[in-house]
C-alpha cells in the first residue's frame, strides 16, 4: 500500500479499516507505508494555556450542496439504505438534515446532524468521520471526560478515573447538571449500529475502537461544546449519598492511558489472542479482535498452535471468549471457524452490490487500488439478479462463496462461545455461523451486528467538498449462509447472562461461571 501523490493518511487508514470484511489485509510493507505517514503529535508546552478550538463556519449554499451530494451518493451506492429503515423514514431524515442548513452552520453542528442522519441507516459501517482539524486538536488538547465507564443495568459505573477521588465501582449520576441517562439517549442517536440493537449502541457509547475511544466522548463536543470543567454528581464506592466533583478534561492521548479492563483501543489480533487450560479438561481461548492488518500474522498457524497446545494439555471442552471482539479481518475470522468446524461449510451465500457504475460521483470518492478496475470493471464479473443486484461470482471469491474445509487441527470437543454487546461485523458473522451449524452454545450478552450479514467489505469514502467531512459508505451486502436470524439485528445467546453492578464491583465474571456450568464436568 504505497502512498501515491495526493493520497492522505486518512485514505490509507480508511483502506486498512474498510478491508475488515473483504479479507484482503495490508502486508508488512503496506503497514510500514501507513506508519510512515503518521504525523507527530506535538503537545502544548508545559504551563501554557491550551489553545481553544474554533469550529469553522460553513455557508448555507455549501452545506446544502454537501447534503445534496450525500443524499445522491447514499441512494446510488448503499446496498442497505432501506434495509432497516423505510424509504419514507430515510426521506424524512434527509428533509430534517436539509432543514438544519438553511443558514450558515458550524462544522460541529453540521457533523452532528450528518451523524444523526447516518445513524438512521442502522449500519455500523455507515458513518461520518469527525472534521480532521478538530480530531487532530483533540489528540493533545483536553476535551475528554476523565474517566472510563461501563453502562450496566442502566447505570454509568466507573472503570477508572484520572482523579483518585472517584474510584472504580463508583456510579456517575449526572454530568454538568444533566442526568447521564439523558446524555446516553441524546448521544446515542448519533451512534451508528446495526439494526435495532440499543444494547450495542450503549456499549459503543462506552467503548469504540473506531472513533475517539468512546461514542460518548466522540460526540459530546457536538452537543455540549468544550467545557473547561466537568461537574459530576456521583455516588462514590462505599458511600450512600451523592457527592459533587469538579474534574478537568483530558486530551485523547492522556485519556487512552486510563485503565479499561480487558478492552484495548485498536487492539491487534496477534496480541489479543491468548489461550490456557482453565481447569482440567477445559480450555479457554480469548480472541479480543479479528483485526489483523496493523501487525499481521498467520491466523491459521496461530489457531493451529492454540488447538494443538490445548489438546496436548488434555482439553476436551473449549470456551471461546469473543466478548470484546467487534470484528476485523476475514482471514482471522475464517481461521477460527476452520478450527471449530467439523465438516465442510460455506461462509456466505452472496456478495451483492447495488451498483457498479457511479457516474460523476467517482470524482468525490476516495478509495484505494486500481480505480479503472474498480469503477469500470467488466460487467461479466457480476451476475445480475432479477431483483437488480450485482452479485460477485463465486469463482472470483472462493474463500467466502465456495465450500471451506475444517482445519487439520480443528477442535473436536464441546464448545461454548462467550458473547457480548460489543460483538459486531465479522465477530457476529462468526457467532451466527457457529450457532447455525450447531457447533457451539452461546453464553453471555446479546450481540450487536447482523447475523444475516453486514453491509461492509470495500467502503467508499465520499468527501463532501464544502465541509471537508468524509462519509463512509459500504458497497457490499455480505449475505451469510445461515438458516435463521433476527431481521432486526443482533443475536440472542442460548444462555442470556446480563452483567450486574454487584458482579462488576466484586470482580465476578458471571458469564464465565455460567459457561462452566453449561459445560458441566469435563
Regions found by a protein language model. Give the residues of each.
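Flexible, low-complexity junctional segments that flank or bridge functional domains
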Residues: 2, 32-318, 322-353, 359-370, ...
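Sec/Tat signal peptide C-region and signal peptidase I cleavage site
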Residues: 28-30
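Conserved acidic, small-residue-rich alpha-beta core segments centered on
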Residues: 170, 330-505
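N-terminal secretory signal peptides
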Residues: 1-11, 15-25
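Short linear Ser/Thr-Pro motifs
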Residues: 25-26, 425
